[in-house]
């Protein structure tokens, strides 16, 4: 009998919810206007600092002989922090986000890259982890 493979399609929202909750708890005093999103479009006025979590295409892992079930997925998230104040602020916020990913046993695969434009500063990193079918409910456990 095949398992319900719908867990795969909820990974992004599960990870987003965990990160949003933990980062809000850690940084709300220092950054009361902190904005966390997983959408690449925003029609509102920009709010800084902004954390953008982007799920990159994953790949199925751990196939069995029947091939009907998704047993695990290699997940990668790109984290982008944008600040209007300073590169230091972007680095500080990104460091906190990466520690949340480390608490969930993600590996940092692309260390922070720093970019600055005319009016903003960005810090970008990527995190990857193999997530098994039975793990989605326990990702938020420390």
Annotate each predicted stretch with a short phrase.
Residues 92-142:
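Acidic-leaning, charged glycine-interspersed low-complexity segments
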Residues 1-6, 71, 135-142:
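Compositionally biased, intrinsically disordered low-complexity segments enriched in polar/Pro/Gly
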Residues 1-64:
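Small/polar-rich, solvent-exposed N-terminal microdomains that initiate assembly or binding
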